[in-house]
């Protein structure tokens, strides 16, 4: 969320950031809402101060035995007391109106982010060829279904569209990928493993900016044994939500920073805007597994931490020897909370194109303000907001797709990458419905 004081101090810079996002200027509207908030608060405070002053005058009038004046003053106090709830409510409403407007505005892009309208304007940063790019091949669902290890029909009977049942060695391969990623990030990259809740409250979803704007993309979990309208919880769309909210409403010491968390979790997304896209296969599902990386830093650390996080995510694909490219997202393709984002896109021979497998974003203090996550500086004891970063390290289902398509053999089998050998119990090829 944005700081209204910063907007007031430099409205032109704020509006310029919004224009780079393709949005209309909003600084004047926000300043007007803030003026209304200040006026409402001032009116309530003036009335309270007047009541306090009149109360003292009542005491003086009674002491002077001026009963007529005392009665008049008491009547005025009663009138002000009657008005107080309305004035307080007006002040609260004005503050909520400003907060609601601020909460609906995306983060402004950093100055180095390339301008553009959509994914076609993203800028390639680098490539890794890995085992080489096969220009064609069978798609993952063709390989999985032919082997009897990937069952979309059974999943549809259980849960509807955009689900899959994995079996046998293919299920083991997916598990191996997740464990491999988690071990890499904890043992070599310095992340602390966390096993977070998969259900979170509104406040957590607001903190990372899934709410209120992206409510329709989420799965709400409403207990059946409570009264209608009672607060429920949300299935996490990404472990970014619980991991980032670990520092919610806290004051950290600068010496604690940076904090680095990782988790391997199921993720749940309604994919409300994905109708007609990637309808076959595992690329876009309501439930998928992902390893998430989250860093909490001091402001001056976040740019360097962003590059470090990207390198950690890239290391997964390099160990798996998968061809990929890194893209800097343009202003029109960035996520709502992002200040700058890198996407890693892995090569899929079956589609003959690159597809996103990781997204690494620095959010500045945008999420921290929503969460009230602060830190105390060591030199002057002053408080400041932390910076937050998040990234996929990486999406396990998409990594499975990439391994299947890039390691496929002419007979339809899939060779297990050497990096996964310690997790596969001697299995070197995926072929047919083995146990």
Swiss-Prot record:
ATP binds at residues 269-271, 356-359. Transmembrane segments: none annotated. Consists of two distinct domains, a catalytic core and a N-terminal extension that is involved in tRNA binding. It is an enzyme of class 6 (ligase). Belongs to the class-II aminoacyl-tRNA synthetase family. Type-1 seryl-tRNA synthetase subfamily. L-serine binds at residues 238-240, 292, 392. Catalyzes the attachment of serine to tRNA(Ser). Is also able to aminoacylate tRNA(Sec) with serine, to form the misacylated tRNA L-seryl-tRNA(Sec), which will be further converted into selenocysteinyl-tRNA(Sec). Homodimer. The tRNA molecule binds across the dimer. This is Serine--tRNA ligase. Pfam families: Seryl_tRNA_N, tRNA-synt_2b. It catalyses: tRNA(Ser) + L-serine + ATP = L-seryl-tRNA(Ser) + AMP + diphosphate + H(+); tRNA(Sec) + L-serine + ATP = L-seryl-tRNA(Sec) + AMP + diphosphate + H(+). The lineage of its organism: Bacteria, Pseudomonadati, Pseudomonadota, Alphaproteobacteria, Hyphomicrobiales. The keyword S-adenosyl-L-methionine does not apply. NCBIfam families: serS. Gene3D superfamilies: Bira Bifunctional Protein, Domain 2, Serine-tRNA synthetase, tRNA binding domain. GO terms for biological process: selenocysteine biosynthetic process; seryl-tRNA aminoacylation.
């Amino acid at each position: 969320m944005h700081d209204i004081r910063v907007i007031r101090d430099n409205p032109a810079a704020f509006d310029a950031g919004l224009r780079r996002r393709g949005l209309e200027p909003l600084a004047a509207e926000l300043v007007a809402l803030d003026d209304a908030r200040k006026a409402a608060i001032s009116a309530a405070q003036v009335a309270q101060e007047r009541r306090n002053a009149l109360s003292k005058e009542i005491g003086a009038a009674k002491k002077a035995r001026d009963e007529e004046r005392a009665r008049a003053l008491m009547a005025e106090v009663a009138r002000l007391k009657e008005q107080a709830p309305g004035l307080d409510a007006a002040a609260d409403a004005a503050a909520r109106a400003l907060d609601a407007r601020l909460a609906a505005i995306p983060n402004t892009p950093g100055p180095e982010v390339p301008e553009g309208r959509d994914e076609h304007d993203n800028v390639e940063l680098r490539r890794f060829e890995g085992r080489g790019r096969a220009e064609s091949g069978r798609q993952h669902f063709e390989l999985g279904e032919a082997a009897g290890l990937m069952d979309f029909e059974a999943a549809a009977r259980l849960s509807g569209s955009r689900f899959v049942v994995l079996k046998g060695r293919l299920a083991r391969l997916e598990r191996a990928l997740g464990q491999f990623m988690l071990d890499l990030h904890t043992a070599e990259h310095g992340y602390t493993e966390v096993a977070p809740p998969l259900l979170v409250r509104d406040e957590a979803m607001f903190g990372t900016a899934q709410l209120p704007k992206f409510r329709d993309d989420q799965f709400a979990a409403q207990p059946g044994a409570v009264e209608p309208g009672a607060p429920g919880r949300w299935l996490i769309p990404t472990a970014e939500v619980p991991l980032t909210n670990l520092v919610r409403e806290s004051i950290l010491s600068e010496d604690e920073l940076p904090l680095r968390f990782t988790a391997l979790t199921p993720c749940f997304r309604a994919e409300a805007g994905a109708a007609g896209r990637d309808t076959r296969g595992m690329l876009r599902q309501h439930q998928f597994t992902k390893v998430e990386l989250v860093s909490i830093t001091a402001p001056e650390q976040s740019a360097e931490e962003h590059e470090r996080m990207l390198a950690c995510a890239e290391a997964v694909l390099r160990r798996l020897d998968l061809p990929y490219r890194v893209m800097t997202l343009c202003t029109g393709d960035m996520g709502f909370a992002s200040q700058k984002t890198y996407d890693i896109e892995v090569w899929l021979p079956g589609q003959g194109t690159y597809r996103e497998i990781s997204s690494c974003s620095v959010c500045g203090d945008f999420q921290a303000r929503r969460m009230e996550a602060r830190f105390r500086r060591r030199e002057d004891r002053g408080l400041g907001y932390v910076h937050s970063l998040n990234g996929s390290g990486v999406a396990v289902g998409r990594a499975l797709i990439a391994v299947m398509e890039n390691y496929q053999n002419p007979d339809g089998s899939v060779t297990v990458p050497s990096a996964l050998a310690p997790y596969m119990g001697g299995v070197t090829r995926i072929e047919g419905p083995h146990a």
